[in-house]
């Protein structure tokens, strides 16, 4: 099948096999129920590598809100209700991401952690200076602090050693789910972390790096 099976022994006791509408369901409601119980979920445990320690909120350095447990909670709930098979994503090239986003932005993302640690830093990489009106916008900085600000709109986009791998796997999850639907599945759920809906053509922000839904 498409993708790699993450959970071979999924409890299927909740799945519905009868075509009859059971008591308490309208035909339309039961159809939705059946579709959801046939739906594949695409998920990658590689998101666990993206585990920022802190973020800047309301003038204070606080524990990061966007953390692995957010996705893990949903993953565990999918299993608990027997929503359907959970599969891993296939690997996808970044060609489409570079059509949605500026290629130089996508090329920058895998380099952030190495650039950060090359300066002797060990904590979460966060931007703290941003280009403002009146400064030249046609020249990209070549130092990591300037580059982080150049490619972001807030300080909610921390990087640690596993962040890029999580970004890439989230991108792959979305594309794999999209292909399942294109191949005839009625529905597929892309359980993406980090999320992507705030990311723009040339910038990250709001915990988002690649706009997964736009790419898919």
Label for each model-derived stretch:
Residues 3-9:
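Intrinsic low-complexity, disordered N-terminal segments enriched in polar/charged/small residues
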Residues 4, 18, 38-41:
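N-terminal leader/targeting segments
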Residues 12-18:
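N-terminal, intrinsically disordered charge-dense segments
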Residues 18-30:
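Positively charged N-terminal leader segments that act as targeting/secretion signals
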Residues 32-35:
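Generic detector of N-terminal low-structure segments
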Residues 37-216:
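HDAC/HDAC-like amidohydrolase catalytic core signature
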